[in-house]
């Protein structure tokens, strides 16, 4: 089956490369030089080349690591499409990635599942949408997209009308599903691709410098750091490294978390990243501690229990399994809607065995059983963080995780910072 999907994707892309959408003539009206200046700075030649390439091609890959201006470039392309009175559709593989897409474009974005109207009744699942006929489709975080979703996107593309921009960062982690689609598409000699490689604010932004050096496998920490040493990076000192041992790492992380809360940081803006779900420094252990600091219980709090976990109003949770046909806040079933794996929200109300949760500004009513598909999300794994944007990430790197902590994983963690 996967071999068939792979062959179909290749065939559809070949057709796409040869076709000429009806609205191509509108793209030919643009002069990229008119968009040379934006957001107060000059566009690079590679950023402008995307507009030039888009004029004559129907499918393009925009690749580049964090800080190279992918978001700014896509925002500019969207402005051009608006000027040409063209429709734009945004998709991403996860709810968190779609939310980031919405933040930097100002347009609604959906998960690929939602965009293709995925439904499931019993054991039968299918994508209801028959055709993608937007003038421009932008798929973000392609490194997280597997062959299955790529196949269903390609199957529904109307190549007579729609142009496609695939956006990704090949330094990030591949999809947990079958296939490394971004990597494979980048290897194609036929698909036009723009790779942005100039990292802006490398010297003055500590987080960007750390993320870039991690990606390149370049050492950036002093070799003589001792226990309890603190090292800052960048002119703005926004990357702070604490040297400590595993024996006190958990205690010091908790102290840091508590200090950030006392400074007035919103718990929603702080997220702890770790490599594993289990173990002393795993997600499960960390969430028990951080829940107490971020959202301590009171005696009269309404509490709902699932296994040995207790949840109450204000707790941050992540959905870890797609929920089909959920109920709105009044308990009415939302046919053909879905809460996606990876969507994050917070509990707003609890009544006996029911609770209400806000996902991305929309409230859903759920019963106690739904908690089996959720986890507290004060701490999450690097894999779950991919595609998200975090105001204040706390990245823990215990010595016991050294065999898991490769440069790609560390890069993903550091590049989540806003």
PLM features per residue range, with description:
Residues 86, 134, 160-163, 189-194, ...:
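Short glycine-/polar-rich loops that comprise or flank the Walker A/P-loop
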Residues 48-51, 56-229:
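ASCE P-loop NTPase helicase motor core
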Residues 40-44, 117-125, 299-301:
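Short gly/ser/thr-rich secondary-structure transition/capping motifs
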Residues 1-52:
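Pre-P-loop entry segment of helicase/translocase ATPase cores
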Residues 341-418:
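C-terminal accessory regions
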Residues 90, 166, 272-274, 395:
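Structural beta-sheet core signal
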Residues 8, 49-53, 170-339:
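Conserved helicase motor core of P-loop NTPases
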């Amino acid at each position: 089956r996967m071999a068939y999907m792979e062959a179909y994707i290749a065939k559809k892309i070949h057709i796409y490369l040869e076709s000429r959408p009806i609205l191509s003539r509108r793209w030919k009206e643009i002069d990229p030089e008119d968009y040379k200046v934006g957001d107060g700075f000059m566009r690079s030649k590679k950023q402008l080349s995307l507009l030039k390439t888009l004029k004559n091609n129907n499918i393009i890959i925009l690749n580049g690591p964090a800080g190279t201006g992918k978001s700014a470039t896509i925002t500019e392309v969207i402005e051009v499409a608006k000027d040409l009175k063209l429709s734009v559709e945004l998709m991403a593989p996860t709810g968190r990635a779609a939310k980031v897409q919405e933040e930097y474009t100002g347009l609604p974005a959906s998960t690929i599942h939602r965009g293709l109207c995925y439904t499931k009744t019993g054991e039968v699942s299918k994508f209801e949408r028959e055709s993608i006929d937007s003038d421009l489709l932008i798929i973000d975080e392609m490194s997280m997209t597997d062959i299955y979703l790529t196949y269903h996107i390609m199957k529904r593309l109307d190549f007579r009308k729609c142009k496609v921009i695939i956006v990704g960062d090949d330094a990030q982690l591949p999809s947990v599903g079958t296939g490394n689609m971004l990597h494979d598409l980048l290897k194609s000699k036929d698909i036009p691709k723009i790779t942005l490689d100039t990292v802006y604010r490398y010297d003055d932004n500590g987080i960007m410098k750390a993320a870039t050096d991690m990606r390149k496998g370049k050492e950036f920490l002093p070799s003589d750091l001792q226990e309890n040493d603190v090292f800052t990076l960048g002119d703005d000192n926004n990357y702070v490294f604490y040297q400590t041992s595993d024996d006190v790492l958990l205690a010091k992380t908790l102290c840091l978390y508590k200090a950030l809360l006392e400074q007035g940081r919103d718990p929603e803006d702080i997220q702890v990243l770790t490599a594993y779900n289990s173990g002393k420094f795993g997600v499960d252990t960390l969430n028990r501690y951080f829940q107490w600091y971020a959202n301590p219980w009171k005696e009269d709090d309404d509490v709902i229990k699932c296994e040995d976990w207790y949840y109450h109003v204000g707790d941050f949770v992540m959905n870890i399994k797609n929920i089909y046909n959920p109920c709105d806040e009044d308990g009415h079933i939302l046919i053909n809607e879905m809460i996606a794996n990876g969507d994050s929200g917070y509990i707003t109300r609890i009544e006996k065995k029911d609770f209400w949760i806000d996902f991305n500004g929309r409230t859903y009513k759920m019963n106690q059983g739904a908690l089996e598909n959720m986890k507290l999300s004060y701490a999450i794994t690097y894999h779950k963080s991919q595609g998200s944007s975090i105001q204040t990430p706390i990245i823990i790197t215990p010595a016991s995780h050294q065999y898991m902590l490769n440069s790609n994983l560390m890069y993903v963690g550091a590049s989540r910072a806003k």
